[in-house]
Amino acid sequence: EIEKQDTIGLFGEDNIMLTDLILRMESNDLNNCSLVKSSPLVFRESPDESEIENYLNAGICPAGRVIRVVESYQNLDTRIQSGFDFSLYYSAINSFGNFNFSLNITKLEKFKQKAGNDFIRLIEAQENGIIPKELAISGFSDLLEKDGSPKIQANLKLIWNKGSWGLGLFGQHIGEFYETRNKLSDGSLWNVKAYNTISGYIDYRLNLNSNNSRIRLGIKNITDERAPLASDIFGYYFDKHDNLGRHYYLDLSYKF
């Protein structure tokens, strides 16, 4: 188990927006909207006439649409992680050729982030009814299988060659997790499903002018697996998943 104090990380755009909402609601005064406070990290455009009318009818000082949220790294208090890594390697040389096999599995069993002062302020505001219960506060408490932190990840690799021929096979598994920023109508969290891909290649080595050369034909994502749907910026977690689908490549190499 690893415990890190004063971990560095991002507070999160959603949480910054909630902080901005709290400041606006706590300082809301229709008699003098110029005194309303807001987060310096949230930039808005000027509200139009219809937006101003809607805000005033709701008893809230007008605010324009958000055009930019600035994030910076900060201390996020204590983080606790525990789990294990499993690795298996095997190689063999026989009449069928040379074989190399590897399997790596990572299992995360605990991943917790203690709430620092910024998170505590959001929690207290929600408990006091300043912000709705339906708005999720993310980035603290139990983070296991939440927002891009799957419990299990695995990679497999098999390489074979004999004479001039070679073959490679690769597998990847990224376990499921849940998005805390999205809730279904029944209150449950949005499930980002597990992601599995298989890729491979076949190549042939040849001698051209006494130099080693190689021609390789490969297929990435043989099963045409698509990234599971999520509310991240590209519609999926680009740092975890790939949405290119099946694609082929031809690689020619020549050593001078």
What label would you give each PLM region?
Residues K4-Q5, G9-R181:
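Gram-negative outer-membrane beta-barrel transporters
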Residues L23-E26, G116, N128-E134, G187, ...:
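Short, surface-exposed, polar/charged, turn-prone segments marking secondary-structure boundaries
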Residues S82-F86, I152-L156, N196-I202, R246-L252:
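Hydrophobic, lipid-facing positions within transmembrane beta-strands of outer-membrane proteins
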Residues N94-F96, K193, L208-S210:
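A cross-taxa feature marking solvent-exposed loop/turn segments within ectodomains of secreted
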Residues E109-K112, G168-R181, Y204-F256:
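C-terminal beta-signal and adjacent terminal beta-strands/loops
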Residues G171, T180-T197:
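Generic long, charged, amphipathic alpha-helical segments
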